[in-house]
């Protein structure tokens, strides 16, 4: 994937970061822990800071982009307090001493008390002005943690949904670094269902039709043109691709919860 990144997925919006490899169904199954740089006229914002292992890659990608002349990095927007999203936070704050962390900043002061003065709370509708474009905190329709916010870039209509469009891809099929519409052999409903089954367990106890309808309303209201998920390939054709992801979310909700299933199998196999 190294030759494809950083990749500009919308004007001034750059996809950076790396894959996390694991075995699944006998193949090398990759999940992204992506980050995105949104470059304005006066400042740039980094959305997510990546998995801890990815900091050297993210630092290199940021260096390449800054060397090209993008505006200085002044803001960090992390969707929520989970390692694949904020795992590079301390090192990014140290590397870029003028950067301010924005969003729901709950608990970060406990890990980084020396950076507490560089943390800025945001609520829905609050904006970060980058010059010529802004980054808004918007409703997190599908969230992992209570503290989740999604981000939305106003000029080119890019949505940053964190875990909201989470799905993996197959390394062996050359999907790394592609946008969703380029990965023609990727079964999006299937890989979306796998991710939701393993990571978003609450979807099994909710009416996902309601959540998917709410997602459609948000996309329509904001006029979203591009979707940049943390754990999936960027979506550049919203009308074509979003229905496939929703199909996977609804399918996963109908599957038995994996951990409970395994316990039942073990209990049934145990001697009386």
Segments from the language model and where they lie:
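Short catalytic-loop micro-motif centered on adjacent basic/acidic residues
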Residues: 45-48, 75-79, 137
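C-terminal regulatory/interaction regions
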Residues: 1-3, 236-272
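Conserved beta-strand hairpin/beta-sheet module of binuclear metal-dependent hydrolase folds
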Residues: 4-64, 150-153, 157-161
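Short, glycine/acidic-enriched loop or turn micro-motifs at the edges of active sites
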Residues: 51-52, 83, 166, 234
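Active-site metal-binding motif and surrounding structural segment of the metallo-beta-lactamase
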Residues: 54-101
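Metallo-beta-lactamase
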Residues: 7-8, 96-229, 234-237, ...
């Amino acid at each position: 994937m190294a030759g494809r990144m950083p990749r500009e997925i919308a004007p001034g919006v750059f996809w950076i970061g790396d894959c996390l490899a694991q075995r699944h169904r006998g193949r090398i199954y990759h999940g992204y822990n992506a980050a995105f740089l949104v470059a304005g006229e006066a400042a740039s914002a980094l959305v997510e800071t990546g998995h801890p292992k990815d900091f050297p890659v993210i630092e290199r990608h940021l260096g390449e982009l800054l060397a090209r002349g993008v505006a200085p990095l002044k803001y960090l927007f992390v969707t929520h307090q989970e390692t694949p999203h904020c795992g590079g936070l301390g090192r990014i704050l140290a590397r870029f001493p003028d950067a301010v962390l924005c969003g729901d900043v709950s608990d970060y002061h406990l890990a980084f008390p020396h950076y507490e003065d560089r943390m800025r709370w945001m609520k829905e509708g609050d904006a970060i002005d980058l010059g010529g474009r802004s980054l808004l905190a918007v409703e997190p329709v599908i969230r992992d943690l209570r503290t989740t916010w999604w981000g939305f870039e106003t000029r080119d209509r890019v949505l940053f949904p964190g875990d909201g469009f989470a799905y993996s891809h197959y390394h062996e099929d050359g999907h790394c670094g592609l946008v969703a519409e380029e990965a023609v052999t990727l079964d999006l409903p299937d890989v979306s269902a796998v991710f939701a089954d393993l990571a978003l367990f609450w979807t099994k106890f909710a009416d996902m039709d309601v959540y998917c309808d709410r997602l459609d309303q948000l996309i329509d209201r904001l006029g979203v043109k591009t979707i940049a998920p943390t754990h999936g390939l960027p979506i550049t054709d919203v009308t074509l691709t979003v229905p496939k992801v929703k199909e996977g979310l609804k399918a996963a909700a109908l599957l038995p919860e994996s951990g409970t299933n395994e316990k039942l199998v073990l209990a049934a196999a145990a001697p009386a």
